[in-house]
């Protein structure tokens, strides 16, 4: 019990005061105002001390201010007049952007210390890597029997995002300032169309919104993983230590009322160590090899958690539990599709004079090439038209020949590195053809020639040799050609370790 209490106890000494950095408002306004508001000011890999003092914050803001040379000169007087006097929305946006920069500093150090010190989070930290998703699907997923695709719901109101911060912040004026930012973009008292309000806010203030949303997901997953680790049965004693926290602990008694009380003695014998949890974008996957009864238990856990703690309305019918032997599961992450499909194999066996047929169902992880969404994205990026016919890229025509080829090569390599694992490569060849011909037409546009004349003049030159070289040839230069191991590796699944970003060309929203 003491172990649970230590983990769940809210450490008041680590709560943060956030308003004091705003005494350096001239630095903050200049820092954010001079930067592109549509971009992001990322503070990466900075070893912040856990003791974030006033002096540390002042030095950091001053250093960022000086490095970006964002001093507003007197020549910008007219523009500043419009900024300070008339454009209130931009004024609020600048303050909120600066606010997001400031509050990320102590939360970064606190999150890092939590990841280093809490045993509950340590095992989960390994799953934060993007690379861990692909081996999971390849090595684990095909051996599981039940899967549930869960859509993480958005909070019905932005006030819920603000309330989540109350567990970590003890500065009441901070929340008034926070609400004043949100009030600029949506009607605070309106519940008619919350999705539209959240969508408009996320577009106008992306960094600020993602800070709140990521904190919401982090809070949800921390509670979920605690339940996952500590509640291997449904006894009420497992949750008796949870009554300390605001809101959630006041309503946690509803969380254990998942099944009738007659089942409690039976369910206490079940263990569920094989519940796998994977989150990608705004969705998550629950998969298990056990009976569907345990999957139903966790489904109602999630429903009760969202309703009781986050006040998010979600119904059990929105979460479907499917059996992989009867259901082909589609997985989408960062612009990439994967599919677990079933292969039916018929084996003829003969025993003495009798022969019989045995049907074996095998699950196989296969990658799908979403040809229509990719062509739509290529057309949006001006590589082809809506019908998939390649066109030149005019904005790249001013680059050098090497620069043009290098940019096309990067895009093609990123797509090829993932989709080469697909068993159906016809669609992939079409994408490669579009990129190749678009590259040639861009070079033709630069040299003011025709495609036929350019290719004829190119002749024996090896300018496009790398672009037309397939990945099989590139791998054969790295490994021995006569190696049969290479053929077996390439014929199977190869997850390239440089797939660390989402596919920008595919946007399914």
From Swiss-Prot:
Pfam families named among the record's database cross-references: Intron_maturas2 (PF01348), MatK_N (PF01824)
GO cellular component, as recorded: chloroplast
The keyword Electron transport belongs to this UniProt entry's keyword annotation: no
Top-rank taxon: Eukaryota
Compartmental location: Plastid, Chloroplast
Keywords: Chloroplast, mRNA processing, Plastid, RNA-binding, tRNA processing
GO MF: RNA binding
InterPro entries, per the entry: Domain_X, Maturase_MatK, Maturase_MatK_N
A GO BP entry: RNA splicing
PANTHER family in the record: MATURASE K
HAMAP family assigned to the protein according to its UniProt record, in alphabetical order: MatK
Described purpose of this protein according to its UniProt entry: Usually encoded in the trnK tRNA gene intron. Probably assists in splicing its own and other chloroplast group II introns.
Family: Belongs to the intron maturase 2 family. MatK subfamily.
Name of the featured protein: Maturase K
Source organism of the structure: Dalea purpurea (Violet prairie clover)
